Amino acid sequence: VNLFTLIKYAGHMEATEKITPGNEPLTGKGWDKLDIERSAAQPAIYLFFMVLGQLGTSLTAWLTYEYEWQYVYYFMMGLLLLCILITFVTMPYHKYTTRRFPINFKQFGNASIFCITLTCITYVLTYGKVLDWYDDPTIQWATVGAVVAGILFVHIEVTLRNPYYQFDVLKLRTIRFGFLFYFLLMVLNSSSMFVNVFTGIGMKLDNYQNATLGNWSMLGYFIGGIATIWLSVKGVHFKYLFAAGFLFLGLSAMFMYFEVQGAGLYERMKYPIIIRSTGMMLLYSLIPTFATQRMPYKYLSSWICTMLTVRMVLAPSIGTALYSNVLQERQQHYITRYAQNVDMMHPEASASFTQTVQGMQYQGKSKQEAVNMAAISTKGRIQVQATLSAVKEMAGWTLYACLFCMIFVVVLPYPKRKLLT
């Protein structure tokens, strides 16, 4: 709703006419023209909102760093009140076609059940590893809740005359592939954690410095958005644009593979962020255009619902859980591996241990305290090296996954869908 209002007041265009059922183009040429318009318009819209999102993230990190985390909520409440005031001041004469309030809460129960399903799934994926999966009763109940709420939602939607979600949308081939592409994108995009882990472990940066480093993603969004608009207008096929997007994600992972080391440079960490955000923008803004080719407008709300579910909830949750759990497992693997050779027989480890013990004793520590401090220092160095090795290994596997996705989107057939009514 906010997007359509923004387009109406900023561009003096009634965007709802492009999505109202019954206003679909009647010919193939009309649909092709609409696809070209979407290919140029959607990247600009996504660029605008993604830049705003990054600015919000940076501002949140600054407020937390300079003040306290509670101030973030105070700021958000004040900003919402300001937005309400601006809305009343700048849009006082909006006329509705009827006297009835335009928001319908008839299907509030359906949406609530759907949200319960997603909440339970997200809880299981996020806290499963921490709580030892199904040995914890909360994970068990969350799984039961997700299954029961999911079955109830499907039953309600199938039996209703005017359902909240139309399952016929899943019969459209491009829609199914759109969901798959978004899933692959958001899972692989979870590799953005490599930069934060590397800078946090290897460079000892805090959250605010990491957030400041993340501002370079806006440059990548801008490059990706401009490139997407230009290539789309030139008529470049979707498969080549999708392949380019996954290629950029792979290049970002490859950069991290060769860059991760004990003496990394903070200034160089902006490059994987720019490369990854460029590839993300290519895919993020064009997948909806591909998925909704010749799609009847009656399926638009169902498409948006499923798109947001996959793009904003399921895929990021799965990707974050996958990368964090694998990182922890590989980190433990390398700690065990490196610790086997660290003893007093190892010249370098022995010299470092002895030097730390002597330094602690010079500071007035007892011999036992000095030995304990030296052991902790040795353990810390092993953990750092193990984490860097785990990040390097995962970056390599991410590169292979991106290459696989790139080949997949190139060899996939892209036939024009027959017109539906």
List each model region and its residues.
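Transmembrane core module of solute transporters
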Residues: 164-285
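Hydrophobic transmembrane architecture of multi-pass small-molecule transporters
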Residues: 313-414, 420
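Alpha-helical transmembrane segments of multi-pass secondary-active solute transporters
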Residues: 41-42, 71-76, 138-142, 210, ...
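Hydrophobic transmembrane-helix bundles of small-molecule transporters
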Residues: 65-180
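Interfacial helix-cap and linker-helix signal at transmembrane-aqueous boundaries
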Residues: 59-68, 125, 199-200, 231-232, ...
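Glycine/proline-centered helix-kink
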Residues: 49-62, 118, 193, 225, ...
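Small-residue-rich alpha-helical segments with characteristic i,i+4
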Residues: 272-348
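Helix-loop-helix hairpins in multi-pass membrane proteins, especially solute transporters
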Residues: 1-110
